[in-house]
Structures are given as structure tokens and as C-alpha cells.
Amino acid sequence: MADVQERLKKLGASARIGTGKGTPRRKVKRAPARSGADDKKLQQSLKKLNVQPIQAIEEVNMFKSDGNVIHFAAPKVHAAVPSNTFAIYGNGEDKELTELVPGILNQLGPDSLASLRKLAESYQNMQQKKDDDDEIPDLVAGESFENKVE
């Protein structure tokens, strides 16, 4: 029983500022939640631009210069056409272009099509290298396998 009380005293001592019984416990410092304030400021500035919600948008893809894509599935989109401003809300995922290829062919611009061609060429080159690494010699008419091995 005595060692339990000693352990409790050690635990209690770490949670107190002073050493006396009447001292208050240490307050936990918490960082203020700023994301809500940032969202409110963003909403206010978008409201000044007179943005309107755009309905029925299934996905948004943003093509990056390195060939990857930021993909938003079922985002909320607001637009202010006169000021050429668009706001996209949702969880974005970084994906490679090859993951989205069948569904986004009609969305690709000339730059993205060029990067897609490069990806296809590199994929074909990798496949050819895999096929060539078999270490099986090619046979020519009139030669036998034993002659080729020696």
C-alpha cells in the first residue's frame, strides 16, 4: 500500500507547478483552432466576388507539371466567371496519370497528351527490356540448340 502511495505522489508531483498541497494543477496549453477562422475569411472574400455554386460536377482533375494529377472526387465547386475565379472544395488525392487514363482521355490537353505518350513509350521500352532478358538464345534455321549453347 505504501509503494502505491509513493507512485501516486510521483505522478501527482509531475502534474503540479509548485510543491505545496494548495497549488493549482498545471494548465495544458492548446493551440487555437485556426482552420475555422481561415475558412470564414475565405468564404467572406469569395462572397465579395459573388461566386455561384456549380452543380453536378462529378470530378475535378488538376494536371501538374511533373505528370501527376490532383484528383478531386465529387467536389463542391463555386465560380465567379467575371473575375475568372474558381473555388474547389473536397479531399484531393495525388495520383499518377496512368491510374486515371481510361476516364480522362477527353480531358487531356496537348501538354498532358505529350506526357501520356512519353509514359506509354517508357512502358513499352520496359516491356521490351523484360522480354529481352530471358537469356534464351535465338535459333537460326540450320543451327541446333547445342551448338548455340557452346
Curated annotation (Swiss-Prot):
GO terms for cellular component: nascent polypeptide-associated complex; nucleus. Residues 36-101 form the NAC-A/B domain. Disulfide bonds: none annotated. Residues 23-32 have a biased composition (Basic residues). It is found in: Cytoplasm; Nucleus. InterPro entries: BTF3, NAC_A/B_dom_sf, Nas_poly-pep-assoc_cplx_dom. One of its GO terms (biological process) is protein transport. It comes from the Eukaryota. Keywords: Cytoplasm, Nucleus, Protein transport, Repressor, Transcription, Transcription regulation, Transport. Its main location: cytoplasm. It holds the Pfam family NAC. Residues 1-45, 123-150 are annotated as: Disordered. Belongs to the NAC-beta family. Part of the nascent polypeptide-associated complex (NAC), consisting of EGD2 and EGD1. NAC associates with ribosomes via EGD1. Component of the nascent polypeptide-associated complex (NAC), a dynamic component of the ribosomal exit tunnel, protecting the emerging polypeptides from interaction with other cytoplasmic proteins to ensure appropriate nascent protein targeting. The NAC complex also promotes mitochondrial protein import by enhancing productive ribosome interactions with the outer mitochondrial membrane and blocks the inappropriate interaction of ribosomes translating non-secretory nascent polypeptides with translocation sites in the membrane of the endoplasmic reticulum. This is Nascent polypeptide-associated complex subunit beta.
